[in-house]
Regions:
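Intrinsically disordered, low-complexity terminal regions
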Residues: 1-266
C-alpha cells in the first residue's frame, strides 16, 4: 500500500513538472529569457561567517584560498518588470557576509508570468563558516569547505556537498541529497544529513574510517562497506563503525526513500 501511495505521488509530481514545462515552453516561444548579470566582491576574514537566502535557481559555492567573497549572480525572467523586481542585498562586514535575495511578487492570476530565478556562483574563504544557505527550489552545490560548519536547507531539488571537511547539517525536503568525498582526512567531523522524500547517497574512499548511523523510514539502507542492514518494523537501518580510529560520524536519515553508501575506487 505504501509503495502504491509512493508511486501515485511520483506520477502526480511528474504530471505537474510536465505541465509547468509546457507553460515555460509557451512563454519561451512568446519571448526570450532576459538576463542581468551582477558581480560583486567583498572582503571576508578566513574565520568569517557567510550566509545566503536564495530564490529558485542554482547555487554553487566553492571554498578558495582567498580572503574575499566573490559573487556572480545571473538573474533571469521573461519580462523586464519581473527581472527588475529581483533584488539582491548584501550586508558585508569584516567577519560577516550575508546575502538576501527577494523574488518578484507573486501574481494574482493563476496563469500569469511567474518567472524569476537567480543562478549564483560564489567563491568564499574555504575556512569560513557557512551559517545558513536557504534555497526553495533548484540545485545547491557546496565544494571544498574546511571551516567550522555548514548549514544548508533545500525545499525541492538536488543538494550536493563535495570534499567538505567540516561539520555539516544539511536537509532536503524533496529530491536528492548527496555527500561526496574523494579522500578522507584525520580531522574529526560530524555530518547530519536528512531527506524527507527522495534518496540519499554518500560516496567515500575505500580506506575511509567512520561511524555510520543510517535509517530509512520507508525504504532501504545499503552500503558497499557493510551488508549489515537490520529492519525494525518499516525502518531499515545500519549502525556500524567502519575501519580503525574512526573520527568521522555520519548520521543519515530518509523518510520516504533509500540510502546508499558507495566506495570510491581509484
Amino acid at each position: 500500500m505504501k509503495n502504491i501511495r509512493y508511486a501515485l505521488r511520483k506520477i502526480a509530481l511528474t504530471t505537474t513538472v510536465l505541465f509547468l514545462g509546457s507553460l515555460i515552453a509557451s512563454s519561451l516561444r512568446a519571448g526570450e529569457v532576459l538576463e542581468d548579470v551582477v558581480e560583486k566582491r567583498f572582503p571576508l576574514a578566513p574565520s568569517g561567517t557567510f550566509s545566503l537566502r536564495a530564490i529558485d535557481g542554482t547555487v554553487e559555492i566553492f571554498g578558495t584560498d582567498s580572503q574575499e567573497v566573490k559573487i556572480v549572480a545571473v538573474k533571469k525572467a521573461f519580462s523586464p518588470e519581473r527581472l527588475n523586481a529581483i533584488a539582491i542585498r548584501v550586508d558585508a562586514r569584516q567577519n560577516v557576509v550575508n546575502i538576501e535575495t527577494t523574488p518578484p511578487p507573486v501574481p494574482h492570476h493563476h496563469f500569469s508570468d511567474r518567472s524569476g530565478t537567480v543562478e549564483y556562483t560564489i567563491n568564499i574563504p574555504q575556512t569560513a563558516r557557512i551559517a545558513r544557505i536557504e534555497l526553495p527550489n533548484g540545485e545547491l552545490v557546496i565544494d571544498g569547505m574546511r571551516g567550522a560548519s555548514i548549514a544548508a536547507n533545500l525545499s525541492s531539488g538536488q543538494l550536493v556537498t563535495h570534499n567538505c571537511f567540516c561539520d555539516q547539517t544539511i536537509h532536503v525536503n524533496q529530491g536528492e541529497l548527496n555527500v561526496f568525498f574523494d579522500w578522507m582526512e584525520e580531522r574529526p567531523i560530524s555530518i547530519e544529513a536528512k531527506i524527507e522524500d527522495g534518496n540519499l547517497s554518500a560516496r567515500l574512499p575505500t580506506d575511509a574510517a567512520f561511524h555510520l548511523q543510517a535509517v530509512a523510514k520507508e525504504g532501504h539502507v545499503s552500503s558497499d562497506f557493510s551488508p549489515m542492514e537490520t529492519r525494525k518494523g518499516d525502518d531499515s537501518e545500519i549502525n556500524e563503525v567502519i575501519g580503525d580510529n574512526a573520527t568521522t560520524k555520519l548520521s543519515f536519515r530518509a523518510g520516504e526513500g533509500n540510502i546508499h553508501i558507495s566506495e570510491v575506487i581509484w
